[in-house]
Amino acid sequence: MMAKLMITVMMVLLLSLQQGADGRSERWRKNQMAASRIMRNLITARGDPPRFCVHKICYEDSECNQWCTGGCNPTQGKCDTA
């Protein structure tokens, strides 16, 4: 786990150091956005985004992850966001 985190941090640092010269500014900007998104996810330790809740089949609320704020929808048998 620590090695994976270190690799991710190194990747983010490399993306952050890339220069936006010679017509590469758009790619550099996209890399900056990706790097900041990765760091934000690492800092907040987020799991799956909410869009994956509707695909998870469940029988009780405890089977749904933290993003499925609606818990288990008994009529559909799937996790729900609200």
Swiss-Prot record:
<keyword id="KW-0301">Gamma-carboxyglutamic acid</keyword>
<dbReference type="GO" id="GO:0090729">
    <property type="term" value="F:toxin activity"/>
</dbReference>
<feature type="disulfide bond">
    <location>
        <begin position="58"/>
        <end position="72"/>
    </location>
</feature>
<keyword id="KW-0800">Toxin</keyword>
<keyword id="KW-0732">Signal</keyword>
<keyword id="KW-1015">Disulfide bond</keyword>
<dbReference type="GO" id="GO:0005576">
    <property type="term" value="C:extracellular region"/>
</dbReference>
<feature type="modified residue" description="4-hydroxyproline">
    <location>
        <position position="50"/>
    </location>
</feature>
<feature type="propeptide">
    <location>
        <begin position="24"/>
        <end position="46"/>
    </location>
</feature>
<feature type="disulfide bond">
    <location>
        <begin position="64"/>
        <end position="79"/>
    </location>
</feature>
<keyword id="KW-0964">Secreted</keyword>
<feature type="modified residue" description="4-hydroxyproline">
    <location>
        <position position="49"/>
    </location>
</feature>
<dbReference type="InterPro" id="IPR026210">
    <property type="entry name" value="Toxin_Pg"/>
</dbReference>
<feature type="modified residue" description="4-carboxyglutamate">
    <location>
        <position position="63"/>
    </location>
</feature>
<feature type="modified residue" description="4-carboxyglutamate">
    <location>
        <position position="60"/>
    </location>
</feature>
<feature type="signal peptide">
    <location>
        <begin position="1"/>
        <end position="23"/>
    </location>
</feature>
<protein>
    <recommendedName>
        <fullName>Turripeptide Gdm9.1</fullName>
    </recommendedName>
</protein>
<feature type="disulfide bond">
    <location>
        <begin position="53"/>
        <end position="68"/>
    </location>
</feature>
<keyword id="KW-0379">Hydroxylation</keyword>
<comment type="similarity">
    <text>Belongs to the Pg turripeptide superfamily.</text>
</comment>
